[in-house]
Amino acid sequence: INERDTVSQANLQEAAHGLGVGMILDLGVDTFMGNVPDADTQALHAASLIGQGEVSVSPLSMAVLAASAAQGQIVTPVLVKGQDLADAQPAAGVTVTAAESKQLKTMMRAVVTEGSLGDLRQLTPNTAIGKTGTAEYGKETPPKTHSWVIAVHEDMAVALVVEDGDFGSVTGQPIVKAFLQD
């Protein structure tokens, strides 16, 4: 939120698109890859910077975001049904820069080594990166929440949302850890 005067909504939208948010996919099933809309007030812009306000994403878009941050380029998801993925190619278009990818990986690694996803340090090898989140919704005070976790370990990216969950580190972390271990 403190960056609202230095990071414009257009900058935020460009960064999100560079990580796959809003991309158009043809997977043979309906997909929603997220949206970072224009913000017509400073309050809405500030909320957008932390993924609140009118920003909307899906577990698929967040898994792509995490994988794209880790790979340094937009990762295109593919539905797998017993086929060889050797010919899979990255998506074309604007992508995250090498410097941006490095910064994101450093910050996401710190969430594991020093922050709210500490249990992921138990994965072998100890290289996981991730981020937790809490999405507020409704008009109640305090608002209801959904808990989020995105993580990347080795060649696997995962996004988890638990509807009406507690904080991502409390509700989502054990689920993501179990998924990445198996």
Regions found by a protein language model. Give the residues of each.
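Beta-lactam-recognizing serine transpeptidase/beta-lactamase-like catalytic domain environment
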Residues: 1-164
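Short amphipathic alpha-helical face segments that pack within enzyme cores
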Residues: 58-64, 171-178
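A short acidic/glycine-rich loop-to-helix N-cap element
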Residues: 162-172
